[in-house]
Each structure stands twice: as C-alpha cells, then as structure tokens.
C-alpha cells in the first residue's frame, strides 16, 4: 500500500540517494499515485513517500512555521472536534482541511503520536533536536517493514522496496513460511523474508546522526486492559455515545466516499446512525457474477440502501475476472508482499471497480472482531504428505505460537495481533486502489469495548444499537436470517434455511469433504453446484480451479520449478492436482496455498 520509504544512514549521499530512488520506484504501482522525496544529509535521512492522488496523505511534506520540523504522514487521521481550532488559537498557521495540522500537533504534544486516531505511519525530522522519529499507529495496521544493516536502517511500507536495494535478503524465513502455511499469516512481527521485520504497534523509534538511538513505544495495551468493567446497561450507553458521536469523523474529507454494504450487522450499524440525506451516499455490494442468483449480501444490502433512500449497485465477480485470473493472481501476491493467498485475488479486481465509484470506501470491517470478539484465523494442518518432513516442524511450531497468543485479553488479541497480522494482507491489497475506512478501530470505541461485560458480547448489543439508530433497519433480516425483533416460527424457519445454505455452500465449495467430492463427480453431468453456490459467496474456487482455471492450475503447479521446491513432496502434489482437476477430490485450500507460495518464489525469492 502507499506509504513512507527510505533509509537512515551514515552513507555518503552519492550512495544513499540512488537507493532511495529505487525504493520509491518499487512502490509506484498505479498511475494515480504521487511520489516525493526529502533528504537531510545532516540527519542522515533519505526519505520518500507514495500516496494516492488527492488522498489525505497527498501534499507531503508538512512543515512548521520555523521550517525546522518536517513531517511526512501516510494513512488517515480522524481528530477530535476542535483540534484545528485549538491549534489556530495557539498561533499556528494551517489549513482548515487536510493533514497540515499534524506537524503542529508534533510541536505541541510531547507524547506525539499517542493522541492520533487512525491507521497511519510517518516520520518526523526535527532539526532543532537533531532527531528523526519513525512511528506507526497503535494497532500496527499501517505496516512498516524494516531492515537493520551495519551502515543503514531501511524502512518501507512494502517489503519489496527493501528487497530492491538489498537483494541478499531474498531468502525465505522458514519460521515465517511455516506460519503462513499453518495460519495464513506471519505472526509476532516477523515476515516471509529473512532479515526483514515489522515495526511493532505503537512504535516511535528515534534516530540521531544516522543511527538508531531508542526503540520507543508510546502506548501499552495494559492501559486499556486494566480498566474496570462496566455493568451491561452502562456499557451499552457508553458504547452508543462513543459510536454515535465519533462516526461522522469517518465521513469527513474532500474525497468522494462510497459505502460498502453487506448483509451483516456492522455496515448496518453505520447506516443506522449516519442517517445520510437521500441519494447522497453511493452504496455498493460485491456480488456473484455467475448468473445463478443474487447472493444474500446483495439482497439484504439492497433492502438497507432502499430503506435509507440511497442508490445501490452491485459490483460482480464473473467472466472478466476469470479471463484475467493469472494477472490478478500475480498482482495479489506482489502488491501484498505475499501476505494474502489467492482467495483474495477477486478483492483486487473488486476494489479496482469500487474506486471508479469513489476513491474512499467505508466498510464495517473489524466490527465483529471488536464488538463480538470473533476469531478470524487459527492454525490448520495441511494434507498429509504434501510438505516435506524437514519443513513440518515449522508448521507445527506455528500452532504453538498461536496458542500462546490466546492467553491474553481477547480484545487485545483481536486488535493488536489478529488485526495487524491476519487482516493486514487484505487491507494492504485493497489500499493499493483506494482509502479504506472503518469506525470500528476508533481509539475511543476500542477503549470502551475493553470494558465490556461478558454478557454484552453477542449480537443483541449490535441489534439494539441498530434499533436505537433506525428502527426500520432493525426489521431487515441479516444475510443469515438474524432479526432480534421477530421470534415467530416462520422467522426461525427462515433463519434455519439460510443457515443451511450458508453451511452447505461452504461444504460444497472449498470445504467439501473427499467422500462428497467423489459423489459430486458422479453427479457432475447434472451440475449440482447450481443448487448450492452463490447464496453467500461471490467466489467459488473449488469449481473454478476444476473447470475454468484448470489450465492455469496445471501449468503452475506441475511446472518443474514448482515441483522442485524443497519443502514440497512432488508425488503428493501431482496426485492432488490431478484429483482436483478430475473432480473427484477437493484440494482447494492446498491449491490456494501452493500457488501462493510459488508466486512468492517467482516474484520475490527467485527474482534478483
């Protein structure tokens, strides 16, 4: 995703500046990106940045009135009301809109960036103090990769920028690779690459004279964990107050904003309290372009948009995406630095189209994880015989690491571990195309949720919040039939049917057991997939890999380069590919993983 990039070094300028140029170019992915550089030899700072044109972060660098502080900021910040007015009263010169106030917050607030609210990364160069401070948000969602060498400290929003100037780092880290196979992400601020790490959440690392002096942290999760729990009613009232008061911050700004609606609760809570004027907020939903049926997300989202008097459209995944799958597969892995597998390749396609509607996408992301403590990832063991015995210990170790992470506070797991490790990859991919917003990582909201009693962790709080904001929206069933206001027999039966198809679709697609795959193969002339697919999901990779994408799967996975990877067992991989393409076996998850690993090799590890 767009962000800061560069090096802090004692190297002479004629050596450091060419490296900076290559690092910036490594992040220039789109024609709507803008780039810049700022160099201060006295500080040993060679700084670059990439931003989407007209986004909050466009227009860097920021300077104070004395021009002895330079700040470069990437991401978005959602300040308290009155912040800019207060700074003007203090005598600062700044624009009413945009990020110019941030450099003055740095001057005024000794704890900067502790007071910032949002997902961000940045760097402050202070000539008066002769310091450089590299910082990120308290959740670590706007990731900064780094590498420490003997002569330089490299940092970048994407790992590929560091690989561009330090090719010796194009080596897979076995522990990171094992975690990616087992959990779908790399944990504990490691990466897939040896020698490249991730800046921990809430970092403020200070450099002087080209050298790292202090690895500072401006926030400790215990500050929120050690709060006194609230009683159920007090918690609800506080949650309602914070959510309703802070929500409008996330709709500020000069760019056009689109609402990404789903059939669930979290985007509906936003609509219930935003109360947009008629036809003022473009709404859209990602849907299945296969022509079978409108998925439940689309059906429910259309009802919500209609109730709010907003225009709604469907962005489908269909033949256009499938015809260019190899392009989107490669770009998904490349743009995310291998942090997501090919399950999310449709998301790149969809967000390209969403940008055409609006360059800012409002979502309900992270609502279920924060408010209802949903666990979005866990370790899983691969099919026996696919990976070599030498590599299996790294996969097993991932499960032990994960188990240790669950020992702390469940909200801390959700926002300080699950969010920056598991959710980061999709966020990074989507933000290559547009600015993604969600009110569910708001500082005040998350702080409040840490005080939730155990009785307030289900759907009831969210349903009540919707009803208090807009009683009409409460009446609309969710994509899975949930509606807290109606307990009739017909409502229960309706929800049961939707739950059946929700689970049946998973079982008929990527989750199909091997015995069922053999039956499906015998019934294939009758196309039983038409009965089950398209109810809840807009992608159907088991069938796609078997049919439309079979040539791509065969070409990639039976290629001698793939079969020769030392951690793979060749014969088992060949048997899996042939079984899946024939149709009497289901290895969707394994094909996802091995295809992604192979693309990581070809794009990052084999490339020099």
Q: Which functions belong to the PLM regions below?
A:
Residues 224-233, 257, 283-288, 331-336, ...:
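Glycine- and acidic
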Residues 266, 366-367:
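Catalytic metal-binding/acid-base residues of hydrolase active sites
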Residues 98-102, 117-120, 174, 298, ...:
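Conserved glycosyltransferase catalytic-site signature
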Residues 287-350, 368-386, 403, 410, ...:
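ATP-dependent adenylate-handling ligase core
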Residues 1-320, 328-329, 595, 601-603:
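Cysteine-centered catalytic environments shared across enzyme families
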Residues 252-254, 354-358:
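Glycine-rich phosphate-binding loop signature in dinucleotide/nucleotide-binding domains
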Residues 1-7, 41, 164, 195-196, ...:
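Adenosyl-5′-phosphate
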Residues 257-259, 360-363:
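Short glycine-rich phosphate-binding loop at a beta-alpha junction
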């Amino acid at each position: 995703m767009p962000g800061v990039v560069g090096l802090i070094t004692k190297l002479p300028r004629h050596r450091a500046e060419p490296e900076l140029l290559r690092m910036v170019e490594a992040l220039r992915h789109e024609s709507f990106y803008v780039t810049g550089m700022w160099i201060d030899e006295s500080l040993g700072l060679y700084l670059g940045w990439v931003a989407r044109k007209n986004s909050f972060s466009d227009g860097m660098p920021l300077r104070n009135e004395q021009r002895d502080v330079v700040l470069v900021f990437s991401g978005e910040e959602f300040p308290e009301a009155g912040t800019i007015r207060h700074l003007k009263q203090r005598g600062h010169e700044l624009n009413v809109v945009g990020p110019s106030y941030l450099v003055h917050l740095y001057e005024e607030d000794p704890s900067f960036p502790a007071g910032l609210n949002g997902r961000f990364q940045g760097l402050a160069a202070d000539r008066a103090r002769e310091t450089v401070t590299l910082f990120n948000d308290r959740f670590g969602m706007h990731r900064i990769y780094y590498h420490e060498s003997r002569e330089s400290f490299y940092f970048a929003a994407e790992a590929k920028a560091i690989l561009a100037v330090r090719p010796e780092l194009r080596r897979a880290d076995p522990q990171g690779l094992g975690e990616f196979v087992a959990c779908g992400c790399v944990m504990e601020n490691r990466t897939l690459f040896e020698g490249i790490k991730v800046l921990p959440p809430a970092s403020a690392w200070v450099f002087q004279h080209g050298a790292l002096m202090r690895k500072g942290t401006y926030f400790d999760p215990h500050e929120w964990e050690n709060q006194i729990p609230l009683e159920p009613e007090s918690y609800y009232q506080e949650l309602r107050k914070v959510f309703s008061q802070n929500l409008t911050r996330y709709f500020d700004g000069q760019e056009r904003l689109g609402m990404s609606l789903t059939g669930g609760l979290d985007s509906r809570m936003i609509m219930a309290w935003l109360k947009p004027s008629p036809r003022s907020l473009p709404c859209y939903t990602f849907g299945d372009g296969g022509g079978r049926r409108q998925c439940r997300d689309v059906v429910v989202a259309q009802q919500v948009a209609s109730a709010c008097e907003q225009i709604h459209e469907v962005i489908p995944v269909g033949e256009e995406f499938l015809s260019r799958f190899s392009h989107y597969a490669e770009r998904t892995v490349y743009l995310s630095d291998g942090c997501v597998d090919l399950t999310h390749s449709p998301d790149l396609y969809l967000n390209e189209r969403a940008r055409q509607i609006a360059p800012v996408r409002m979502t309900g992301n992270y609502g279920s994880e924060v408010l209802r403590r949903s666990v979005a990832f866990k370790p899983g063991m691969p099919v026996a015989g696919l990976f070599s015995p030498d590599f299996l210990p790294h996969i097993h170790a991932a499960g032990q690491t994960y188990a240790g992470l669950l020992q702390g506070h469940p909200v801390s797991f959700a926002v300080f571990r699950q969010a920056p490790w598991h959710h980061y990859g999709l966020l990074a991919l989507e933000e290559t195309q547009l600015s993604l917003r969600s009110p569910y990582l708001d500082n005040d909201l998350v702080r409040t949720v840490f005080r939730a009693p155990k009785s307030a962790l289900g759907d009831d709080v969210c349903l009540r919040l919707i009803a208090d904001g807009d009683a009409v929206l409460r009446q609309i069933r969710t994509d899975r039939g949930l509606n807290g206001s109606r307990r009739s027999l017909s409502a229960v039966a309706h929800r049961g049917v939707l739950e059946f198809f929700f689970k049946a679709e998973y079982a008929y697609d990527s989750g199909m057991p091997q015995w069922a795959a053999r039956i499906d193969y015998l019934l294939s002339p009758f196309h039983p997939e038409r009965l089950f697919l398209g109810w809840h999901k807009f992608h159907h990779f088991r069938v796609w890999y078997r049919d439309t994408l079979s040539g791509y799967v065969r070409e990639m996975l039976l290629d001698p380069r793939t079969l020769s990877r030392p951690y793979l067992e060749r014969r088992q991989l060949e048997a899996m590919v042939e079984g899946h393409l024939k149709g009497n076996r289901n290895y969707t998850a394994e094909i996802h993983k091995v295809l992604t690993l192979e693309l990581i090799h070809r794009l990052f590890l084999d490339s020099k």
